[in-house]
């Protein structure tokens, strides 16, 4: 499980390398389930690699 989360975190990192994305767009780009996406985001957040930004009702994620 830990290895899969790390792999998914790498895929999220690659998707965010071109700039911040809204959560729904990120999920579509990396083709992960909601559970797997949030696990990968948690991994990257704990490592202080990403930031979250709320605009209106949408949440964006980007690389630090």
Residue ranges and their predicted role:
Residues 32-43:
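Short amphipathic alpha-helical interaction segments
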Residues 48:
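Glycine-centered, phosphate/nucleic-acid-interacting loop/turn motifs that mediate DNA/RNA or nucleotide
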Residues 25-29:
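A short acidic, leucine-rich amphipathic alpha-helix
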Residues 15-16:
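Short helix-to-turn junction characteristic of helix-turn-helix DNA-binding domains
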Residues 2, 30-31:
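A generic secondary-structure micro-motif detector
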Residues 2-9, 19-22, 54-64:
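Short, cationic-aromatic polyanion-contact patches
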């Amino acid at each position: 499980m830990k290895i899969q989360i790390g792999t998914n975190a790498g895929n999220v990192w690659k998707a965010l390398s071109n700039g911040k994305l809204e959560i729904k767009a990120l999920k579509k780009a990396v083709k992960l389930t909601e559970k797997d996406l949030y696990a990968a985001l948690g991994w990257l957040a704990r490592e202080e690699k990403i930031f979250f930004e709320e605009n209106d009702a949408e949440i964006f994620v980007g690389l630090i």
